[in-house]
Amino acid sequence: MSIEVQNISKNYGAQKALDNVSFSVKKGEIVGFLGPNGAGKSTLMKILTTYITADEGKAEVNGNDVSVNQKMVQQSVGYLPEHNPLYLDLYVREYLEFNADVYKVSKSRIEEVIELTGLLPESHKKIGQLSKGYRQRVGLATALLHNPDVLILDEPTTGLDPNQLVEIRNVIKNVGK
């Protein structure tokens, strides 16, 4: 199993964000969380990516407990948060090179990810000059740099126009293959 969640609960004060959530995701599956605003979807993703801890229950990614083996989980997960943290004054390639240094990833992997996400025509531009769709692609490229086993994307299509929506879904589908 790539992801195993058992009885996860999370409270923010008196507000219950997650209540006894359980599920599993097998390698190769592409799944989505559906629910209204405030249903706990982003909270669950933050737990799975070790940004926050659950109050109760257990979650594993590739057999690693997210509350015990944070480093192993982080190495095996690529995460695109809802609010994509980009440095708008950096060039696309420069930004990816910076992130690649953090993961100790080769220059050839940067080129692979640029190609995979369709960023080649925009790779010479500053991130601040890009459309929302291309900024999402930069975030996705960053999440893919270290060739993670698991990819967690929080609202990757929010704010995209219909054409960009189709394009980013196709990129995600191709990455999942």
Short names for language-model regions:
Residues 3, 10-177:
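ABC transporter nucleotide-binding domains
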